Amino acid sequence: MSLAKAKEIVSGNPVAVFSKTYCPFCVSVKDLLSKLGATFKAVELDSEKDGSEIQAALAEWTGQRTVPNVFIGRKHIGGCDATTALHREGKLLPLLTEAGAIAKTSTA
């Protein structure tokens, strides 16, 4: 059930961040996404009744047990390091735009 819930969240949102409210790496990723103007769904596993089950299901699905666990355009990205590395390389914004998390603008 928890895996189905996780997959439903991932498929229903351009960006999904499985997070914990007290995790500084999670806060960093959510802050970065917000600064970039991305629309994302944050699932705070420590606030969810079945959060530990969802986290275990994510580990089974992605091989990553740690948070944040980031998905963009239904693709598993990884955690904070992977997300910030994509940003440093100039690859995060195009991924977010392609996924529909950022509105395309005509301004340069």
From Swiss-Prot:
The keyword Electron transport applies. It comes from Solanum lycopersicum. Belongs to the glutaredoxin family. CPYC subfamily. This is Glutaredoxin. It comes from the Eukaryota. Pfam families: Glutaredoxin. Has a glutathione-disulfide oxidoreductase activity in the presence of NADPH and glutathione reductase. Reduces low molecular weight disulfides and proteins. CDD domains: GRX_GRXh_1_2_like. Residues 3-103 form the Glutaredoxin domain. Keywords: Cytoplasm, Disulfide bond, Electron transport, Redox-active center, Transport. It is found in: Cytoplasm. GO terms for biological process: cellular response to oxidative stress. Its main location: cytoplasm. GO terms for cellular component: cytoplasm. GO terms for molecular function: glutathione disulfide oxidoreductase activity. Disulfide bonds join C23-C26.
